[in-house]
Amino acid sequence: VRGIVSVEIRLEQAGDEAAIYKVTTDAFRGRPYAGGDEQDLLNRLRELGQLALSLVAMDGDQLVGQITFSPVTLSDGSEPWFGLGPVSVTPEHQSQGIGSQLIRSGLDEISARGALGCVLTGNPAYYQRFGFELAPKNVPKEEPREFFQLKLLSATKAEGIFAFHSAFYDSHVR
C-alpha cells in the first residue's frame, strides 16, 4: 500500500460516462480475472436502468475510480438485494485505499436504502475485510463457487439462489 489518498466520493453524474468507461477499461486491462468487457457491461446496465448505485472517486477534478451496485434477485423472492461490481480504480491510483473507500461508501448507501445484503464474485482474500463470506449455497450456476460471496446487511437470511441481471452474461441484451 502506497499510502491512503483522500478522494471525494460522489454519485455518478451525467457527463461522467466517458471517464468511467476509460477508468474501467484501464483498471481491468491485462488482469487475469478480467472478462475484458467490464466497461461495456457498465454501459449495458446504465442503458437498461439497472445501475441501482454508481459512485465515483474524484481526485480534484479527475475521476479516478468507480463502483457499481445493481439489483440481484434471490429465488426466495425476498428483496432488495444488490450485486457489487465492477469496482475500478485507475492503475496509477491503485493500492492507495480508493477502492476500499468506494466499497465502504457504497455498502453504507445501499444499507441506508434498506438492502438485505450484497453479493459479488471476486477474490475472497480481498473482500473478506469488508465482511463478505463465501456463499456456496446461494451461488448462481454461472458463477464460480470459490469466488461468490455474500454480505448480509440485515437480519434476513439468504435462502435460495441469487441471479445477476442477464446483461452480465449476454452482451446483446439491450
List each language-model region with its residue ranges:
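C-terminal "cap" of GNAT-fold acetyltransferases
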Residues: 140-174
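Short alpha-helical functional segments enriched in proximate histidine and acidic residues
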Residues: 27, 109, 126
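Conserved acetyl-CoA-binding loop-helix of GNAT-fold acetyltransferases
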Residues: 89, 95-108, 120
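Short, Lys/Arg-enriched N-terminal segments with co-localized hydrophobic residues
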Residues: 1-5
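Conserved acetyl-CoA binding element of GNAT-fold acetyltransferases
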Residues: 78-91
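Conserved active-site alpha-helix within GNAT-family acetyltransferase domains
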Residues: 112-116, 121-145
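Active-site rim helix/loop that mediates acceptor-substrate recognition in acyltransferases
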Residues: 21, 27-73
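A short beta-loop-alpha structural element at the N-terminal edge
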Residues: 7-20
